[in-house]
């Protein structure tokens, strides 16, 4: 299974624009769930030194799409038509865990959930909290 998913990751890295940026690595798959390690390099940061929100959305879009593509055996390439995001706190340059989960799959529409978290906690939340 890991080898099969890594074929899709390699295709995404070689043919996709954002696939070249995030450098995804496989962590875990089970039906309806995918976990990857990705990286936010320096060119994804905003002037404040945190990951630009659109880059976070792009990584979420990628991991959710890759799950659906894999489960459809590569027969579909989905469009994200209604992507909502909530940014609870900033992310910083470095490795992140990206997860995707299928909530409900219909004939033409899939509801999914994606989450991101950094692999480390530096800088400390105290460094960016406003008092």
Per-segment meaning from a language model:
Residues 16, 50, 75-77, 92, ...:
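A generic structural micro-feature
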Residues 88-113, 117-122:
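Beta-rich strand-turn-strand
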Residues 20-22, 32-34, 77-83, 94, ...:
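A generic structural signal for short beta-strands and their flanking turns/coil linkers
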